[in-house]
Amino acid sequence: MKRLQWAKSHQHWTVDDWKRVIFSDETKVNRFASDGKAYAWKLPHEELNSRHVQQTVKHGGGNIMVWSCLTWEGVGWIVDVGHRMNSEGYLEVLKDDLLKTMESYGLDSSKVVFQQDNDPKHTSKIVKEWINQQPFEALEWPPQSPDLNPIEHMWAHLKRELFHSYEAPPTSMHELWERIGQTRYAISKEECQKYIESMPKRCAAVIKAKGRWTKLFCQI
């Protein structure tokens, strides 16, 4: 199993090794909370307000598909990639937003290891050719392994902040995008480092599970 082989081949990587990795992924951010059930919390003495009540919305209220990356220095640039991004569009994201992230954090690209999953857009010929021409190294990634990617914690953090930091849902997609940009800054460098520091534990969990999927991503 590729997941098990990958975890074994990286089980001796130290946190210093993982510090070099830029983890990347896309995620869908809904205008009205989650994809399925919606939950709200209030203190016993609190009165029910607009934050606690989910409005009924025709057609689900809409969502934005975004790309970003997670580095040891903090959250990378976040970009709205649309719902039909192809390999050409993804390549533009790498050329623009990935490189801007490296530049903004002062990262030495020759020491960077770039991670992406095996989505066909990511593994297309034009993307592979461009990556092969870059000074940074590409990290081979096992299939179906979101539990190994610490950026999933970053996305969960961002979505929690979007839900809890405002009294009411955004009134438009433009406002949702504005909130995403603002919420990015609520995720600290220290939190990003905590997520990346979990990589040895993630590898160990996959080995213990003999390559099967783990629940570690819920337990940091």
Enumerate the predicted regions with their spans:
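Extended, low-complexity cationic-aromatic segments
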Residues: 2-99, 209-210
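Structural signal for hydrophobic/aromatic residues that build the beta-strand cores
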Residues: 7, 24-25, 68, 114-117, ...
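C-terminal anion-handling pockets and recognition modules
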Residues: 16-21, 27-28, 144, 151-220
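Acidic/histidine-rich, metal-coordinating catalytic segments
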Residues: 24-26, 94, 108-122, 145-149
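RNase H-like polynucleotidyl transferase catalytic core
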Residues: 53, 114-118, 132-153, 166
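Short, well-ordered secondary-structure "scaffold" segments embedded in the functional core
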Residues: 93, 102-104, 114-115, 131
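Surface-exposed helix-capping loop/turn segments at secondary-structure junctions
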Residues: 102-112, 188-194
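Preference for well-ordered, secondary-structure-rich cores of eukaryotic proteins
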Residues: 106, 113-114, 126, 133, ...
